[in-house]
Amino acid sequence: MYHPGRSPSFLITLANVICAAILFDIHTGGYQPGSLIPIVAWMTPFVTLLWLSASFATYLYKYVRTRLLPEEKVARVYYTAQSAPYFDPALGVMMQFAPSHGGASIEVQVNPSWISLLGGSLKINGDDASNESAVLGSFYSSVKPGDEPASLVAIKSGPQTIGFGCRTKIDGDDCLFTANHVWNNSMRPTALAKRGKQVAIEDWETPLSCDHKMLDFVVVRVPKHVWSKLGVKATQLVCPSDKDAVTCYGGSSSDNLLSGTGVCSKVDFSWKLTHSCPTAAGWSGTPIYSSRGVVGMHVGFEDIGKLNRGVNAFYVSNYLLRSQETLPPELSVIEIPFEDVETRSYEFIEVEIKGRGKAKLGKREFAWIPESGKYWADDDDDSLPPPPKVVDGKMVWSSAQETVAEPLNLPAGGRVKALAALSQLAGYDFKEGEAASTRGMPLRFVGQSACKFRELCRKDTPDEVLRATRVFPELSDFSWPERGSKAELHSLLLQAGKFNPTGIPRNLEGACQNLLERYPASKSCYCLRGEAWSFDAVYEEVCKKAQSAEINEKASPGVPLSRLASTNKDLLKRHLELVALCVTERLFLLSEAEDLLDESPVDLVRRGLCDPVRLFVKQEPHASRKVREGRFRLISSVSLVDQLVERMLFGPQNQLEIAEWEHIPSKPGMGLSLRQQAKSLFDDLRVKHSRCPAAEADISGFDWSVQDWELWADVEMRIVLGGFGHKLAKAAQNRFSCFMNSVFQLSDGTLIEQQLPGIMKSGSYCTSSTNSRIRCLMAELIGSPWCIAMGDDSVEGWVDGAKDKYMRLGHTCKDYKPCATTISGRLYEVEFCSHVIREDRCWLASWPKTLFKYLSEGKWFFEDLERDVSSSPHWPRIRHYVVGNTPSPHKTNLQNQSPRYGEEVDKTTVNQGYSEHSGSPGHSIEEAQEPEAAPFCCEAASVYPGWGVHGPYCSGDYGSLT
């Protein structure tokens, strides 16, 4: 505790007070002179003064020496966010921050749970011009130097990697293929790099490029010594298939690479594809690799955080940059005249390709834009080649091809030069033989042909299928059919015996008029317009079509050209001029022939108006009951010459219907492998179903029950829709007359004549289009308010008594049932074209046949099976079995793949014990739990309880058939 008596100041003050008291006493005389006390009393103040002086001096000294400094404070340093969160493939969620006191910004890794804040900033680079996007749920892997594809190369601008590309061949040139926005932008490329080494870019030529955002590519001619120095090898560009497993590569340098895997998907537009591989800054132009090669090139994002976009490299290389006229068939892309673009209901994109010109790109079509801005087919007749002239009974072309420079003799009912050679090649020996059959469609043997085909034996069911039957009992219902002329004849007699000729319905004209309103008008082939055709112009167009991607190169050319080559490819390679001349001459004959209705099928062949139709058994698994019965599926192979005749007459019309499938009743252009196409179809059916409940009809042996009046109705509608002139209309009518009056040929050369008009020939170019329109016409005739058809498959508005009405039209309807709905009457599921279609998914219903064929092939291509069956609810167990029991080199990393579109097991189906093998259609859970309802007045009402007791359209009276 503090005590004041212990303080020096207190003691000094006390001593001075005492001394002051003593001095006061001295002053008042209290002490005697000579006493020492006054001296001591004076000394104390003096010492005190000295002490004070010394203390003050000390204070001054310390004061002067003490430095006054600014107050020290704790400095608060903080950083301000300069960007929204973005995604880095190696580090995760990142942000840019700048310090409050100034200075360079820093990159900070933030909490991964903040992924929800990414939003639109999934674009990797963070700036608005970025083309790159991460894909949520995807992963990246580090790639060791040297493990990347040998064709991959990095494109540098100084130390920064601005893109990637690959070495490949474009139209025969060895080149670099990359994105145009990588090669031609503000950051000029300075070097190509591979495995940590780089070579400076010089003034290399870029002969082909396109700067359109949707078709972003450039072709760079890189010297071979550069490729050699870098150790870069060429890769091939391959046609993408839907759901290809693909990989993309990228990174900050060529020896610090990451890879991202995903699935490649085709879209409606063939020049474009989408993929789910994640990308990062500087990945533009990177090749999209599948196990087969490069399927595309990454150019940007399609849907931020979900899907990226690529250019279909195979399409660009083989359709837009190819200098040869012949186009590959893989993508089923066709070139159309520029004037036909305006007949399509969807938008084409217009692109300019440096080194090729301007083009319009559609879904599965493209057209080159004429440089003059005017299509040459729009020229006046005076500017077209002169028409042929008749001189002394001979038709002469003033500018004929060298191979037909001589005047061609065209006497009435005769043949021209090339067709005469064709007939001589066939070696027909026509003779009137005995009747082959008098039941249904009467048939008669009429001779032999010198054009014969190999007689093959039936294929045995392999052990692989027998073993799989223990796991998939559905496979036991299939086997391979018999082959050869004996099987062909037996099946022909069975099929034709079911033909039931009928009269023309009284309401046919009105039904045709109603149907015409649902189809678009088309334009005919430009060289067949007007009444004066140019032989040279027709011949030139035939040559183009013969070399187009539309022709199946692997198919047989039919009778009699199979004597020259076994495939269309080999035939056209060696004898293009002969084929084109035969087609051209036949077109002119068809446009002039009269009174063909009085001619027999043999007479039509003799006159050179058509060729025999070859019959053969289709090599696909057949139901065992059909094999036991000997009722095999026959293909009616129409000759290549007749196919090209049909393409010339009806090609533009059929192509328009394919392009417009979403807007017309006929669906030959439909492709259910794409999710958006299946959804578009189901949405359309749901709307139609709300008008009149949907029903599925199964017509037995449709091709063999087609009536002549149905074929005549189709060709007359074609003439109206195409605006055919008189000459073209006559050619079309005569072609159909030949079409419905055929001579069939078996593999051993036996010729058989049909003696009544009718029957659809399955190998015709018009089969899908004509069958679809006839099928819609049938629905119109029985009173269905709507119908869609793909060949003989249909979904239509319900009609009571439909089976009997179809029978009166000559068609046996073995099954007619309403489509599955929910308890509220909403459309739930349809089966169409062997596919089960629902609102959010679609899968192949005939998977047992596909699996049987796959296991029987002996060549294990897992990707083919996956492409066809992966959307089925049975795919997980199929994949599990195939991966473990077949020796395919293509099955890698399959067990851990994430489910594909439609792959997840359908819980609705499983919960109800639905088996496709049993043939019972699946219904919704709501239907399964539906309580027993009151009696209904008709079958339709019992299936659509939401419509009430009476159901929709109960009367069923939709037009007279007699």
Swiss-Prot record:
One of its GO terms (biological process) is DNA-templated transcription. One of its GO terms (molecular function) is RNA-directed RNA polymerase activity. SUPFAM superfamilies: DNA/RNA polymerases, Trypsin-like serine proteases. It holds the Pfam family Peptidase_S39. InterPro entries: DNA/RNA_pol_sf, Peptidase_S1_PA, Peptidase_S1_PA_chymotrypsin, Peptidase_S39B_luteovirus, RNA-dir_pol_luteovirus. The polyprotein is proteolytically cleaved into several chains by the viral protease. Gene3D superfamilies: Trypsin-like serine proteases (2.40.10.10). Residues 135-335 form the Peptidase S39 domain. Its EC number is 3.4.21.-, 2.7.7.48. It comes from the Viruses. The keyword Protease applies. GO terms for cellular component: host cell membrane; membrane. Residues 692-806 form the RdRp catalytic domain. The active site is at residues 181, 216, 284. Keywords: Covalent protein-RNA linkage, Host membrane, Hydrolase, Membrane, Nucleotide-binding, Nucleotidyltransferase, Protease, RNA-directed RNA polymerase, Serine protease, Transferase, Transmembrane, Transmembrane helix, Viral RNA replication. The chain crosses the membrane at residues 10-30, 36-56, 74-96. The record marks 132-133, 325-326, 402-403 as: Cleavage. It catalyses: RNA(n) + a ribonucleoside 5'-triphosphate = RNA(n+1) + diphosphate. Coiled coil: none annotated. This is Replicase polyprotein P2AB. It comes from Southern bean mosaic virus (isolate Bean/United States/Arkansas) (SBMV).
